[in-house]
Regions:
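Residue-level signal for inorganic ion chemistry
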Residues: 19, 46, 143, 181, ...
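C-terminal charged capping/lid subdomain of soluble metabolic enzymes
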Residues: 2-9, 48, 198-201, 300-379
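Active-site and donor-binding regions of nucleotide-sugar-utilizing enzymes
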Residues: 106-140
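Active-site segments that bind and position negatively charged phosphate/pyrophosphate groups
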Residues: 214-329
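Glycine-rich beta-strand-to-loop/alpha-helix junction loops that act as flexible
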Residues: 84-86, 117-119, 249, 262-263
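A glycine/threonine-rich phosphate-anchoring loop and its flanking beta-alpha core
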Residues: 17, 127-221
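ATP/NTP phosphate-donor binding region
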Residues: 1-112
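Short hydrophobic segments within beta-strands
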Residues: 47-49, 117, 142
Length: 379
């Protein structure tokens, strides 16, 4: 038998919708498309972040009533499953098991729908469960934090933390739709509101000078939760993250670089080192400053741009250093762990100016150590 070779062309549609309120944000339209045909009506399991319910105790009932009102035009909704939010959702194996048991109890099949409403961690673990159950159940994401709406929900990755490592287990799976109800952001504390804008700064620094200048100019308004200022930043950041997935040529990260993880090797390690005392966005903010300093020391970025980046993050109420980072040896282990995750001669993204970057830099560890020392001195 001769060798058999063929290319597989796989087609996915990656839908992002923004609005205010469940209907305006596009939830109804998305679910009607997923109803099922030929006399078959799919079922739907809503999964809701408990953190949202702390601020809006009525939301689970509101969602259930809204889904029921769609009637036969949409999948048949089960009672919501409530999960704890934050990184515990990804750290605790019992939470993943709880989701899988509920999927099994509700007789969820590959034509069913999981609707996950929550922050990035809940989106991750619910998405992972959906991806591995029956080898893939259709997923609709409804992100409820600034970080999830301007970044995390736009990607096609899911995952959980195991063996003390961030996202050690995970999948790539394109959601059926991402529905961003901007009104849900009103439930956030100031700390978690601010935290999400670190990812907007990240994408602006490496991809979009105009967005960076908008954030720099409007930082006080964004921090004070001015709707127009914040929404403009969130929407543009989301679009840039989405465009990287659909136009960047490597949605499933088969290459040797992850430009959207600028600042993240340090961030992931700091989250672990502080036992998640730092939020993801706060850790990313510190990582951005560290890697911008590395870029300066390598002659890639000018000092003024580095200072503007750090100043903008601070103006958004985000940290630019943490005492945990004084343990340089432990923090630098995160760089090696980051490289191991990709495998091969992988590099990191470093800015060359505001709005531009190299995606595959390989700084010497002594340069990175020097950058950490400088950041510590300036803190």
């Amino acid at each position: 038998v001769p060798p058999l070779d063929a290319d597989l062309d796989l087609h996915f549609r990656h839908r992002i919708r923004f609005g205010r309120g469940l209907r305006d944000a596009g939830l109804d339209a998305a679910l009607r498309e997923l109803r099922g045909g030929g006399g078959f009506r799919a079922n739907l399991l809503p999964i809701v972040d408990a953190g949202l319910l702390d601020a809006r105790p009525d939301f689970a009932d509101t969602l259930s009533s809204h889904l029921a009102a769609l009637g036969d035009d949409a999948p048949a909704a089960c009672a919501p499953l409530i999960l704890p939010g934050g990184e515990i959702a990804k750290n605790d194996p019992a939470i993943l098991e709880t989701i899988l048991e509920r999927l099994d109890r509700e007789r969820v099949c590959r034509r069913s729908v999981v609707l996950v409403v929550g922050g990035g961690a809940v989106l991750d673990v619910a998405g992972y469960a959906a991806a591995i159950f029956h080898r893939g159940v259709r997923l609709v994401r409804m992100p409820t934090t600034t970080l999830a709406q301007d970044d995390a929900a736009m990607g096609v990755k899911n995952g959980v933390n195991r063996l003390g490592k961030k996202n050690l287990l995970g999948t790539f799976a394109v959601p059926e739709a991402v529905v961003c109800d901007l009104d849900l952001l009103d439930s956030l504390s100031d700390r978690h509101w601010n935290s999400g804008f670190a990812e907007a700064v990240k994408i602006a620094v490496i991809r979009d000078r105009e967005l960076f200048e908008r954030i720099e100019r409007d930082a006080d308004a964004v921090r004070s939760r001015d709707r127009d200022a914040a929404e403009a930043v969130i929407r543009r950041s989301a679009e840039l993250h989405w465009r990287h997935i659909v136009e960047g040529g490597d949605p499933f990260e088969l290459g040797t670089s992850r430009p959207l993880d600028f600042g993240h090797w340090a961030a992931h390690r700091l989250e672990s080192m502080t036992e998640h005392r730092l939020t993801h966005g706060e850790a990313v903010s510190i990582g951005i400053v560290v890697d911008s300093t590395v870029a300066v020391l390598e002659g890639r970025l000018d000092e003024t741009s580095r200072d503007r980046i750090a100043s903008t993050l601070a103006s958004l109420g985000l940290p630019t250093w943490d005492d945990a980072a004084h343990d340089h040896h432990e923090l630098l282990a995160g760089l090696e762990e980051f490289r191991e995750h990709l495998g091969g001669p992988s590099g990191i993204a470093l800015p060359t100016s505001i709005g531009a970057s190299v995606d595959d830099a390989r700084p010497d560890v002594d340069v990175v150590r020097h950058a950490l020392e400088r950041c510590a001195t300036e803190s």
